[in-house]
Amino acid sequence: MQKQAELYRGKAKTVYSTENPDLLVLEFRNDTSAGDGARIEQFDRKGMVNNKFNHFIMTKLAEAGIPTQMEQLLSDTECLVKKLDMVPVECVVRNRAAGSLVKRLGIEEGIELNPPLFDLFLKNDAMHDPMVNDSYCETFGWVSKENLARMKELTYKANDVLKKLFDDAGLILVDFKLEFGLYKGEVVLGDEFSPDGSRLWDKETLDKMDKDRFRQSLGGLIEAYETVARRLGVQLD
């Protein structure tokens, strides 16, 4: 399947059309951003690592019964995916306190959250992805009540699957975001799952193994991503 016209260029991925109107090519670039795109740097191998990482995770989620847009890997940095009508709201699950939750509530980082918290954010960089709720979604017509309920159900199911997967690899799944879309009327998991959109800590040391290494200028970003991938069993080379 050959990529054709560039349809969308995000902060770290580019989307291309194909000869099949129902399929797209998703290309992972080496770009890494923070501050809603205010700071961007390039890291060798990052596109490759995130592409293969994402394919691995999406495969695990599909095996658990979660519908995903993933079709197949095409190259080190590209995959073939279903074309979704994306919902403009992202779902976030928090198993431990970190990031904006700590700032917003003034609580200690790392506190376990039981049951996990579920948040919704409007995907809008210019507005810094404001937090919203189901009432906003219904009033502004972003997603139907039924489809939002399905998104929440699938997000919690993904959390159950991924918490165990990462725990078995000696990692804590602190939090993560998921994006969904509609494919022929069905709610389907889209976009990506990688250390760019999740927080992962080492169980023993609590070292951060995700994009917080870039946000907080800790260094060793790609080394951390590759360590996580290899612990999970992702074939990088």
UniProtKB/Swiss-Prot annotation:
InterPro entries: SAICAR_synt/ADE2_N, SAICAR_synt_PurC, SAICAR_synth, SAICAR_synthetase, SAICAR_synthetase_CS. GO terms for biological process: 'de novo' IMP biosynthetic process; cobalamin biosynthetic process. Its EC number is 6.3.2.6. One of its GO terms (cellular component) is cytosol. PROSITE patterns: SAICAR_SYNTHETASE_1, SAICAR_SYNTHETASE_2. It comes from the Bacteria. It catalyses: 5-amino-1-(5-phospho-D-ribosyl)imidazole-4-carboxylate + L-aspartate + ATP = (2S)-2-[5-amino-1-(5-phospho-beta-D-ribosyl)imidazole-4-carboxamido]succinate + ADP + phosphate + 2 H(+). Pathway: Purine metabolism; IMP biosynthesis via de novo pathway; 5-amino-1-(5-phospho-D-ribosyl)imidazole-4-carboxamide from 5-amino-1-(5-phospho-D-ribosyl)imidazole-4-carboxylate: step 1/2. GO terms for molecular function: ATP binding; phosphoribosylaminoimidazolesuccinocarboxamide synthase activity. SUPFAM superfamilies: SAICAR synthase-like. Keywords: ATP-binding, Ligase, Nucleotide-binding, Purine biosynthesis. Belongs to the SAICAR synthetase family. This is Phosphoribosylaminoimidazole-succinocarboxamide synthase.
